[in-house]
Amino acid sequence: MTRKKEPFIVVEIEKRMYNDFKDLYNTNRDGIYRGVLDIYTEFKNNSRKRVLTLLVSTDMGVLSWDTEFSFKKLDYQILIKQILPYYEDNEDYEKCAEIKNLHDYFANIN
């Protein structure tokens, strides 16, 4: 019998009614993206890890919703393609610098 691994990061989303998944995602994108950044920071700090899981969990009134996202160390392009534009749009340039540094670290070791 195999035992399921616990997720590395759990993002608990505020309990409330969302119109749909897009509403849930857009409302909570910052917390989800910070979880992704924590995962890539862990990859940087622990070179042995290759895959880490982010669990996004919420209760939407009539439905409990738990979804796991697995991230591979080699898929670091998500930092530039998905995460960075969000923080650029919100003018959080300190976070942009952190993201760029993480991306450059992985680009240089591969």
Positions of predicted regions on the chain:
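Hydrophobic/aromatic side-chain positions at a characteristic register within alpha-helices
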Residues: 88-91
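Short, charge-rich, low-complexity alpha-helical interaction segments
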Residues: 19-71
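Long, acidic/serine-threonine-rich intrinsically disordered regions with weak helical/coil propensity
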Residues: 1-24
